[in-house]
Structure formats: C-alpha cells, structure tokens
Design a protein with these regions (language model features):
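Polar, enzyme-active/binding microenvironments
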Residues: 1-124
Length: 124
C-alpha cells in the first residue's frame, strides 16, 4: 500500500555507494564513497534510532556488493579493491577476510541461490 515516509534515524556519515545487508533484527551498512571509508555501522530494525558503530571493514571502498543470511554478512569488491570481507551480524566487531575476487573493480553485484553465491564485477 502507499503511504508517507517517516524518519527512522541517521547514519554516522553521509557517504554514497554504501553496501547494505540485513538479518531479521539488524541492518548493516558498510563502506561508501566520497570519500572512501571502511566504517561498518548498524541499526536495530525493531526500534527507531541512529546508526551505531559496528566495526571496520578490511578496505576503504564504495560500490561493493553485499549479501547475507540471518547469521553472516559478506561484502566484496568495489573500488579500489578485490577483497571479500565477512561479519557475524549478531556480534559487533571488525570484518574478517573471506578471500579475494579475481579482479579489482567497481560496480560489483551479487546473485544468491540456496547454497551458492556469485559475485560479478564490471571490469574495464
């Protein structure tokens, strides 16, 4: 149905091209551009309020791809990195290394299936 918007709260920074993922209880925002940052922040979905610091990503970048289930969040690619990070959504802390993409590039996208994930990059 159509309706009006209302203010939920504010993020810690005003970067663009932030990667987003979620569980049923938390929304996670990682990185961003203008300038590139490695900040990970979160909101609690069930209550209004500003974002809170979650930890740091391994690299500072924007235009990354993000995906998640109820336990883990994975963020990969973006400019200028090929790193893939992961976090445990229920626990705050810094991201851990999940591996690397074969190329460095922005505009990474994801495709999720039941038991596999594909990360695709636009390589110029």
């Amino acid at each position: 149905t159509f309706g009006n918007t209302s203010d939920f709260g504010d993020l810690l920074s005003t970067n663009t091209a932030i990667a987003g993922l979620a569980s049923n209880t938390r929304g996670i925002f990682q990185g961003g551009s203008n300038p590139n940052t490695n900040v990970i922040q979160f909101i609690t979905i069930s209550s209004l309020g500003n974002a809170t610091d979650f930890g740091d990503a391994l690299k500072s970048c924007g235009y990354s791809a993000a995906l998640s289930n109820q336990v883990r969040g994975v963020v990969g690619g973006g400019g200028p990195t090929n790193a893939i990070d992961y976090i445990t959504i229920a626990q705050t802390g810094n991201a851990l290394d999940f591996g690397d993409l074969s190329n460095t590039g922005e505009f990474t996208i994801t495709s999720e299936m039941i038991n596999r994930v594909l990360l695709h990059q636009l390589v110029e």
